[in-house]
Amino acid sequence: MIKQIIISDSNKKSLKIKSFLIKNFKKKPIFNSNLVIVIGGDGFMLKTLKKNKNSSKFFYGINSGNYGFLMNKFSPKHTIKNFSKAKMITIFPLEMIVKNKQGLIKKSIAINEVSILRQSKQAASLSIQNGAKIIIKKLISDGVLVSTPAGSTAYNLSVHGPILSLNSKKLSISPISPFRPRRWKGKIISDKSIIKIKNLNPKKRPISAVADNLEFRNAKDIIIKTNKKIKFNLLYDSNRSLQKKIKIEQIRKETT
């Protein structure tokens, strides 16, 4: 029999939770070769998912970080019991293809968002397209975000982007501190879209392209699309699902 896999961050809180689980699994083991328990914060979960992007396993996150939006709350009394009752959701990442000023092409996936950020004191000068359709001919700003529904309550929300429900089949494009045009609020588009972002002045106004926390500098042309060939199966406690967390954030946004 193959027992579940436990992956934890290296901080004291994570290791303490891991030790607790191992001790209790010896008393009452869960024989499930498809279950991966991830102990840490959101950043650690994103890192773990990317390392296992070709896996068909189910990931149950336990928060030992700060906010832990993608994680479940740890409870000595209830966590062990919650594994068998957890609800699954499936999310698809973004795929980012970056061509830099030297013509080199790099690729990465992003679970939360792709961030296009100015790389110097100069604001970024960008054009944004959805396929062949121009969304905005010239955006002068600190950058722009392309966010998934799962990531719409993270960095995207901080730049006043819209919160997307998990079943919306949408992506959000949100400007960061737009200077021209000042009133452009971004756009919600289909998750089938192919987004093309071009640096209009790469020599004077360099930009970085960041997939979650992986940065590629001196980007010139960026293509962003949903990768339906990669999927992540996440498990959540039935009383605190990811859908419910997103709904709570929507209500908070509407009432503030």
Question: Which stretches of residues belong to each language-model region?
Answer:
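ATP/nucleoside-binding phosphotransfer catalytic cores, i.e., glycine-rich phosphate-binding loops
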Residues: 108, 116, 133-135, 184-256
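Short, acidic/small-residue loops that bind anionic groups at enzyme active sites
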Residues: 55-71
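Catalytic core of DAGKc-family lipid kinases
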Residues: 67-143
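Short glycine-rich anion-binding loops that position phosphate/pyrophosphate groups of nucleotides
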Residues: 41-44, 65-67, 150-153
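ATP/NTP phosphate-donor binding region
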Residues: 1-35, 39, 44-55, 74-90, ...
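Gly/Ser/Thr-rich active-site loops/lids in small-molecule metabolic enzymes
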Residues: 145-182
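Short hydrophobic core segments
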Residues: 36, 114, 144-148
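Solvent-exposed alpha-helices and their adjacent loops that cap or buttress functional pockets
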Residues: 28-31, 88, 108, 118-121, ...
